[in-house]
């Protein structure tokens, strides 16, 4: 990426082939453009990463914003999230589970609120 991202989204990937497509599409369809997507493969035994790469083909404008990292061994959620946080380049970091999906304006709204309020942390609920 040529400019610093406003938001880095860390998405752990392990055993979610039934859910990950919906998650990816909701992330790639965000109205906020300056996003770094960090998908971390925790040595998933299923086709989750193949699905990710296939869905990426539908969003060529997002390809340069995507990092796919494979852990050396299955390390668990804490280690995966830590790797993501240590390698994120965005002003803000968001953790998104790979079986979740979000509204298309969610991260833009959260980023704008953080900037408006000068907040270090923004939290939200779900509907």
Give residue ranges: language-model regions:
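Nucleotide-sugar donor-binding/catalytic module of glycosyltransferases
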Residues: 1-127
